[in-house]
Regions:
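Structured beta-strand-rich core segments of catalytic domains in phosphoester-bond hydrolases
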Residues: 90-161
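Active-site regions of metal-assisted phosphoester/phosphodiester hydrolases
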Residues: 10, 21-55, 130-161
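Generic secretory/membrane-interface signal
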Residues: 1, 14, 83, 124-126
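Bacterial Sec-dependent N-terminal signal peptides
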Residues: 1-23
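N-terminal, active-site-proximal structural segment of metallo-dependent hydrolase catalytic domains
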Residues: 19-109, 113-117, 123
């Protein structure tokens, strides 16, 4: 009887273990709400986010925001940071380079791709990916076309494969 019970417990324990222990990964979407640098881009309407603009956007406030964004991304992953992070409202490549190289996210070896659309303020979407967990092949952006005449222009979609 003891032997049968022992075998039963062993079989039960064996069946409760997954057959293929695959490691999962996290995906995150984050609207960073106007992640602008402090440099004037004469081709875009980014004047509100200059030191002399309506938001009095200084380097100190900019770098503080980068640190806060890095904290949120790190905390979202619990033990491991998310493998993929979709970002909304990013101004340009510079802010992503600063985010990935001047914050603790530097240790995670993220890479990025982003749209470079025609938004008048220069707001784009981007994807951060950990190259050891995501095999980036390429990306393309798609403009959204509305059929109504009174539509508002929107940002391009980012398609990554």
């Amino acid at each position: 009887m003891t032997r049968t019970l022992t075998i039963f417990i062993c079989v039960l324990a064996f069946l409760s273990c997954p057959a293929n222990a695959q490691s999962g990964f996290r995906i995150m979407s984050y609207n960073v709400e106007n992640l602008f640098d402090t440099d004037d881009n004469p081709d875009k309407n980014d004047n509100d986010f200059l030191p002399s603009g309506n938001h009095h956007w200084t380097r100190g406030r900019y770098y503080h925001k980068l640190q806060q964004i890095a904290k949120v991304i790190s905390a979202a992953g619990e033990w491991n940071t998310p493998a993929l992070v979709a970002l909304c409202e990013v101004e340009n490549d510079s802010v992503l380079i600063h985010l990935l190289n001047r914050t603790p996210l530097k240790q995670q070896q993220y890479r990025y791709c982003m749209t470079h659309g025609s938004d008048t303020r220069g707001i784009n979407t981007a994807l951060l990916y950990q190259r050891d967990q995501f095999g980036y092949i390429g990306h393309r952006e798609h403009s959204v076309v509305f059929t109504r005449k009174n539509h508002k222009h929107t940002r391009n979609l980012l398609h990554v494969w």
